[in-house]
Regions:
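Short, flexible helix-loop junctions that flank or precede catalytic/ligand sites
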Residues: 1-294
């Protein structure tokens, strides 16, 4: 709630109950990226970080990841603010700042509960960041989120929080930046020819123009007169292999990390959105809205 000169401005965050059952297979991952993500979340220790703005589906992806690896033999504990969905078989802790139960206090207690996997809703400060690193380097798997624009800047953000480069490089397994883009209503769509200006704006591959059939949504009551129905995720993944770890140890800048990750197979968010455009899932307007040029 925000008081303004014309009265109270209220924003409601609605959580759909249907999202509880989402699995990794229906979160928009291309097959190759899904294979990479599954590989790293199955490791016995290290950190998996998902970054993006508020409302980019980070928590949904983390819940799906936990459900993927969950078993009776794995002790999974989460620290969240708030607990968005209750997951059977997982120990979920709700933050209560008013009684002193913040992220760092909760984590100090959880370390004595012998968890195998820890989910930290968000790394917000230096103490939380260092506890996460310490936990991941003592034989535990840590999942968390960070507010950052893309995967390379996530590394910079974690360094800014005070994590020493040698510890960050040693503890990271994978970083994934994520965005949500709206999908065209499959029952109300039509063929569309974008202008040369639109294609140049998103740097659409020239060799793909003739072979791509573009679509736009038709506004209808069933899609709330938007032409869109539902959303899908796009992902930008950095696998923190030996070469990437060395770049972090050397305090390489963001551009150097970006170029190295791209050479190692990272698909930037803009390119990931264009892939959805090529297969007719979304529109040029959504690519422009959700991503920026590399």
């Amino acid at each position: 709630i925000l008081p303004t000169v014309h009265g109270e401005k209220v924003v409601l965050r609605l959580l759909g109950s249907g999202e509880k059952t989402l699995t990794l297979t229906n979160l928009g991952f291309p097959e190759n990226k899904l294979k990479v993500f599954r590989n790293w979340i199955s490791k016995p220790y290290g950190m998996v970080i998902i970054s993006g703005p508020t409302g980019s589906g980070k928590s949904t992806t983390l819940y799906a990841a936990l459900q993927e690896i969950q078993s009776e033999t794995i002790n999974i504990t989460t620290v969240e603010d708030p607990v968005e969905y209750q997951v059977p078989g997982i120990n979920q802790v709700q933050i209560h700042e008013t009684i002193g139960l913040n992220f760092s206090a909760s984590l100090r207690s959880i370390l004595r509960q012998d968890p195998d996997v820890l989910l930290i809703g968000e790394i917000r400060d230096e103490e939380t960041a260092n506890i996460a690193v310490k936990f991941s380097m003592t034989g535990h798997l840590v999942f968390s989120t960070v507010h950052a624009n893309d995967a390379p800047s996530t590394i910079m953000r974690l360094l800014d929080l005070g994590i020493p480069a040698f510890l960050l490089g040693a503890s990271l397994n994978l970083i994934m930046a994520q965005r949500l883009i709206r999908t065209i209503d499959p029952d109300h769509k039509e063929k569309y020819t974008p202008t040369d200006k639109e294609l140049r704006r998103i740097n659409f591959p020239k060799d793909k123009v003739k072979s791509t059939q573009f679509y736009t949504g038709i506004p209808d009551r069933s899609n709330h007169n938007t032409g869109y129905k539902g959303r899908t995720a796009i992902h930008e993944i950095i696998e923190v292999d030996r070469h990437m770890k060395q770049l972090i140890f050397d305090n390489s800048n963001q551009n150097e990390i970006f170029e190295a990750a791209r050479k190692n197979g990272m698909t930037p968010l803009r390119n990931a959105a264009i892939e959805k455009l090529i297969v007719g899932t979304t529109t040029v307007d959504e690519v422009i809205r959700a991503t920026v040029e590399d």
